[in-house]
Amino acid sequence: MNVLQLIGRNEELFGTDVEGFSEELNDTVTKSRFLVIGGAGSIGQAVTREIFKRDPKALHVVDISENNMVELVRDIRSTEGYGSGEFKTFALDCGSVEFEALIKNEAPYDYVFNLSALKHVRSEKDPYTLMRMIMVNVFNTIKTLRLAKEMGAKKYFCVSTDKAANPVNMMGASKRIMEMFLMRESLTQEISMARFANVAFSDGSLLHGFNQRFAKKQPFSAPND
């Protein structure tokens, strides 16, 4: 599927920027250690691939999805092969004591990417998943930023959502709270964020769901739950 053709573009949106700064990017990545949290999701996998192909000094990927992590490794080995740096994956929850043990033994990292999130509005339909959403989107961000500061990371990056602008649901509100916390902490740590809209064909997206229905020869549905 040609996604560019589907959305009416001839070139990737940031293609020129990436190409123009390719030498600087390659130089920075080659001599740096990276930690990618939530690296087995759609955005996380894309970020991990971009870092890996520039041969980082170390690239460690954390995600709770063991299956997605295995597929990520298979995909990278099939397309990029092996680099000269260290590449490790860990099937861990970044809110766990096991993650803290990982940081204690594997840190420091120069760049920390926090791409983990509960991103669906439907996840706030019950109090249990809602509590998990707040834990992941807010408190795990606070925790991972604290660890990044303690290890002396050069930069901390976190993904947000367009729904954080004038939020009308708890998912957007949780990300807005996260943004406010990070903006306050940016006085003592270099931090950047990016608000993502709905990412076409990402896991759980509507377009991904359409492909699934086609593949399984199922009718389209409009669930009310």
What are these regions (language model features)?
Residues 170-225:
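NAD(P)-dependent short-chain dehydrogenase/reductase
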Residues 43:
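Hydrophobic/small residue at the entry helix of a nucleotide-binding pocket
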Residues 114, 118-179, 184, 192:
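Conserved Rossmann-fold NAD(P)-dependent oxidoreductase catalytic core, especially the SDR/UDP-sugar
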Residues 46, 50-61, 77, 92-135, ...:
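NAD(P)H-binding glycine-rich loop region in Rossmannoid oxidoreductase-like domains
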Residues 40:
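Conserved glycine-rich cofactor-binding loop
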